[in-house]
Regions:
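Membrane-embedded alpha-helical bundles of multi-pass transporters/translocases
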Residues: 2-465
Length: 465
């Protein structure tokens, strides 16, 4: 029996475009915040890294908090859309603030300015916006194929935006003057673009009525729960923990790829190569995303596709290491593209896997926690990206890197090579290992079979007990 369809083509594109706004913040922040602070503002990489790590202590709480708040929201716009819309206003303001550290301030005041701006951006506004945006996957359709398609559209826009920002920002800043004020100007332009696109995206989709979302389920007063209970439900779901782990590892991977700006500048002696490598990363990802829905159908699920994709990614990154030590930039780009091609399917169907994880919690615990379940997207992005950026700062500081120097010691050059060549390979191997155990689709099928529920049937609360 064919599943009911809920979305038109323009709903899918409108939803997907929301990640333009998300990556205006994320790609810009993770790729260029550290170079801005160390090279233009003159702050120490190690101290910046430590401040980012401290900021992450706040994030774990806010992720669960906003996920729980979304689950409890009842408005004319729905559960998630208000948070997506209004959260981005704060994102735009604090993004500019992160790249507008007054050069006239004392050193301690500069660190304080950055820490407050960064914590508000990541711990509050980006959290509210991103969790709400991700939760829409399960709130605007109940069709599993449409959820996979939404993920593909979303990440096509995400990687296209990331590609564009990584490719043009260095030149854009140089044209604006190349100093700290130039970074502020670029941040303002990016923030305005993100605000406009986020608004259009939120208004392009409509959440299903709660009655339709809960169709076939028995209303149960015990379904109400607080943030502490929501946290316990998440921890009991091993697949949620796996997804959090892969998200964190992916962001650590991304942080090391972002640190490529140092590798290109000091080791390869050409900072403009960073933009060229961005093409090698993002174009194959986009190609893979286009074919992900078809491959999911062909292989009757996401598990095999994701695992095989990351086997290819590991092979690709291993060959990047070989090419790097050979000193061949063309081969490095070619193998970077191969690795990215393998990473693409997981990016495309990740949201659908999270929806399956939410179903797993309902089948095992009898509780609906869709909004809270999607906290893993924000939690993983922020913790992984934040720790990754912090590690970059710590490693650079440890190696003796000083951003304002005309030359760098050999220890710093060796560290840049380790960060850009070896660490991405290590993180890909770890992700492959986790994905080899993330077969939540089969787990749900077995649970439904045990409870006498048809595989394509809407889960009824009375069947859980």
């Amino acid at each position: 029996m064919e599943e009911k369809k809920y979305l038109k083509w323009y709903n899918k594109i409108g939803y997907g475009s929301g990640d333009i706004a998300g990556n205006v913040v994320y790609a810009f922040l993770t790729s260029f915040m550290m170079p801005y602070l160390t090279d233009s503002v003159g702050l120490a990489a190690g101290v910046v890294g430590t401040l980012i790590a401290v900021s992450k202590l706040f994030d774990g709480f806010t992720d669960i908090f906003f996920g729980s708040m979304i689950d409890k929201t009842h408005s004319k716009m729905g559960k998630a859309k208000p948070w997506m819309l209004y959260g981005y206003i704060g994102c735009a303001i604090t993004l500019v603030s992160c790249f507008a550290v007054p050069v006239s301030l004392g050193t301690t005041a500069k660190y304080a300015w950055f820490f407050i701006s960064y914590t508000l951006l990541n711990g509050v506004f980006y959290t509210a916006n991103n969790i709400a945006y991700s939760a829409l996957t399960s709130l605007i359709t109940k069709n599993s194929k449409e959820r996979v398609q939404m993920g593909s559209y979303r990440f096509i826009f995400a990687f296209s935006t990331s590609l564009l920002i990584q490719a043009i920002t260095v030149g854009f800043v140089d044209k604006c003057g190349g100093d700290a004020a130039a970074w502020r100007t670029v941040a303002i332009i990016y923030a305005i673009i993100g605000l406009v696109v986020n608004t259009i995206s939120a208004l392009s989709v409509k959440e299903l009525p709660e009655e339709e979302l809960n169709e076939g389920e028995v209303k149960d007063d015990n379904e109400k729960y607080g943030m502490v209970q929501a946290f316990k439900l998440l921890v009991k779901n091993k697949y949620y923990m796996m997804i959090c782990g892969t998200y964190i590892l992916q962001q650590l991977y991304g942080a090391m790829i972002g640190a490529g700006i140092y590798y290109m500048t000091w080791v390869l002696k050409n900072k403009n190569l960073f933009g060229q490598f961005a093409w090698a990363v993002n174009i194959p990802l986009i190609i893979a995303l286009i074919f992900t829905p078809t491959l999911v159908g062909k292989w009757k699920g996401m598990y095999k596709l994701n695992l095989r994709g990351y086997v290819l990614a590991v092979i690709g990154r291993a060959l990047v290491v070989v090419a790097g030590y050979m000193g061949s930039v063309p081969l490095m780009m070619a193998f970077t593209a191969l690795a990215a091609l393998g990473q693409g399917p997981w990016q495309g169907d990740m949201n659908a896997v999270i929806a399956s994880c939410s179903e797993y919690t309902y089948l095992t615990q009898g509780k609906r926690i869709d909004g809270t379940m999607y906290s893993c997207t924000s939690l993983g992005v922020k913790i992984g990206g934040g720790i990754g950026t912090a590690v970059v700062g710590w490693l650079l500081e440890f190696s003796g890197y000083i951003g304002t120097n005309a030359t760098q010691p050999q220890s710093a050059l060796d560290m840049m090579q380790f960060m850009y060549l070896w660490l991405p390979l290590i993180f890909d191997v770890l992700i492959m290992f986790v994905l080899s155990r993330m077969n939540v689709e089969d787990a749900n099928k077995k649970l439904k079979a045990e409870k006498g529920i048809a595989a394509d049937e809407v889960t009824d609360a009375s069947d859980i007990n």
